[in-house]
């Protein structure tokens, strides 16, 4: 019983000293991260409309501004924005095509760089943006993004079942 008591005391001393060491290394963390995931695939979070003209692109931007305003009021300071969806992107890329979530047509630009816009709007509100990329899977074998990636890098993608 005495040994158990000694082990118990040593364990708590070690745990307490670890906390003091950790605090000494990082006494003032930059800040507390209060983050949300902002999903773009299928318009789950944003966008809820397609940018097929200047007017509709502005409406799409307003949707994001409204979301960010609500997040700011909720004291969110970090947005994890889905920027790459199944081998397609929401920003201009020389490697992968535009995702259809913005324009409604896979491979078609919405007329603006949605990632740049999101970064600028988040920074206006004192928020950070972190890119959330979906790396695997790239999508169904015959989806637009997968086909484009296969054309450019045929050895990069391996078909794993009937759908890809």
Spell out what each predicted region is.
Residues 53-74, 101-125:
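Aromatic- and glycine-enriched glycan-recognition loops and surfaces
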Residues 21-30:
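N-terminal module-boundary/linker segments of secreted carbohydrate-active enzymes
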Residues 30-33, 75-77, 123-129:
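Short, well-ordered coil/turn segments that N-cap beta-strands
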Residues 3-13:
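Sec-dependent N-terminal signal peptides
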Residues 74-110:
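Aromatic-lined carbohydrate-binding/catalytic grooves of carbohydrate-active enzymes
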Residues 16-19:
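Boundary at the C-terminal end of the N-terminal hydrophobic targeting segment
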Residues 31-33, 39, 43-62, 131, ...:
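Active-site-adjacent "subsite" loops/lids of carbohydrate-active enzymes
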Residues 8, 40, 83:
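Residues that line or immediately flank small-molecule/substrate-binding pockets and catalytic motifs
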């Amino acid at each position: 019983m005495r040994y158990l008591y000694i082990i118990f005391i040593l364990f708590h001393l070690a745990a307490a000293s670890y906390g003091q060491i950790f605090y000494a290394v990082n006494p003032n963390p930059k800040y507390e991260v209060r983050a949300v995931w902002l999903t773009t695939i299928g318009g789950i979070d944003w966008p809820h409309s397609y940018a097929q003209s200047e007017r509709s692109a502005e409406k799409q931007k307003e949707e994001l501004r409204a979301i960010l305003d609500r997040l700011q009021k909720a004291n969110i300071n970090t947005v994890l924005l889905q920027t790459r969806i199944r081998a397609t992107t929401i920003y201009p890329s020389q490697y992968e095509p535009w995702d259809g979530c913005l324009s409604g047509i896979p491979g078609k630009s919405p007329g603006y760089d949605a990632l740049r816009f999101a970064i600028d709007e988040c920074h206006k509100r004192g928020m950070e943006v972190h890119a959330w990329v979906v790396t695997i899977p790239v999508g169904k074998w015959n989806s637009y993004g997968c086909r484009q990636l296969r054309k450019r890098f045929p050895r990069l993608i391996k078909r794993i079942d009937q759908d890809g």
